[in-house]
């Protein structure tokens, strides 16, 4: 089980980490006013990066509120997102959503992103089986 905290190891910190996700995303989840891009990170925990510019959300107070809401939603849903680097890109209109609407929208987006990932169990070769009588 993944710890529920949101420490430094759960964040994308450097431009190189963001660039890796932008250059070759292996998963996408577009929403009405947001885009989630994801890429495998080969770690046992997910990492989150936020891109919320002034063009998308004018007021700093609103940008900070949105970032808090997204981080909290990520923290609560990270068990389903293990092994991914995720970048959230804001679009116009994101600042108009209330906290409840944000939480609901991101709950759906995390689930959509988790479903879009190929199963990790699919790495087992088809000729192998745990059944000795097969």
UniProtKB/Swiss-Prot annotation:
<keyword id="KW-0378">Hydrolase</keyword>
<dbReference type="InterPro" id="IPR020568">
    <property type="entry name" value="Ribosomal_Su5_D2-typ_SF"/>
</dbReference>
<comment type="similarity">
    <text>Belongs to the RnpA family.</text>
</comment>
<dbReference type="InterPro" id="IPR014721">
    <property type="entry name" value="Ribsml_uS5_D2-typ_fold_subgr"/>
</dbReference>
<dbReference type="InterPro" id="IPR000100">
    <property type="entry name" value="RNase_P"/>
</dbReference>
<comment type="subunit">
    <text>Consists of a catalytic RNA component (M1 or rnpB) and a protein subunit.</text>
</comment>
<dbReference type="GO" id="GO:0030677">
    <property type="term" value="C:ribonuclease P complex"/>
</dbReference>
<dbReference type="GO" id="GO:0042781">
    <property type="term" value="F:3'-tRNA processing endoribonuclease activity"/>
</dbReference>
<comment type="function">
    <text>RNaseP catalyzes the removal of the 5'-leader sequence from pre-tRNA to produce the mature 5'-terminus. It can also cleave other RNA substrates such as 4.5S RNA. The protein component plays an auxiliary but essential role in vivo by binding to the 5'-leader sequence and broadening the substrate specificity of the ribozyme.</text>
</comment>
<dbReference type="Pfam" id="PF00825">
    <property type="entry name" value="Ribonuclease_P"/>
</dbReference>
<keyword id="KW-0540">Nuclease</keyword>
<protein>
    <recommendedName>
        <fullName>Ribonuclease P protein component</fullName>
        <ecNumber>3.1.26.5</ecNumber>
    </recommendedName>
</protein>
<dbReference type="InterPro" id="IPR020539">
    <property type="entry name" value="RNase_P_CS"/>
</dbReference>
<keyword id="KW-0819">tRNA processing</keyword>
<dbReference type="GO" id="GO:0001682">
    <property type="term" value="P:tRNA 5'-leader removal"/>
</dbReference>
<keyword id="KW-0694">RNA-binding</keyword>
<dbReference type="GO" id="GO:0004526">
    <property type="term" value="F:ribonuclease P activity"/>
</dbReference>
<keyword id="KW-0255">Endonuclease</keyword>
<dbReference type="GO" id="GO:0000049">
    <property type="term" value="F:tRNA binding"/>
</dbReference>
């Amino acid at each position: 089980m993944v710890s529920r905290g949101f420490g430094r190891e759960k964040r994308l910190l450097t431009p190189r980490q963001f660039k890796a996700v932008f250059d070759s995303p292996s998963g996408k989840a577009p929403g009405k006013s947001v885009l989630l891009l994801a890429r495998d990170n080969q770690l046992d925990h997910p990492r989150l990066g936020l891109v919320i510019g002034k063009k998308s959300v004018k007021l700093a107070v609103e940008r900070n509120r949105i970032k808090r809401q997204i981080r909290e939603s990520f923290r609560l849903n990270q068990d389903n997102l293990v092994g991914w680097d995720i970048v959230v890109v804001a679009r116009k209109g994101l600042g108009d959503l209330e906290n409840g609407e944000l939480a609901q929208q991101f709950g759906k987006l995390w689930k959509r992103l988790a479903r879009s990932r190929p199963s990790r169990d699919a790495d087992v070769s088809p000729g192998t089986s745990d059944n000795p009588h097969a």
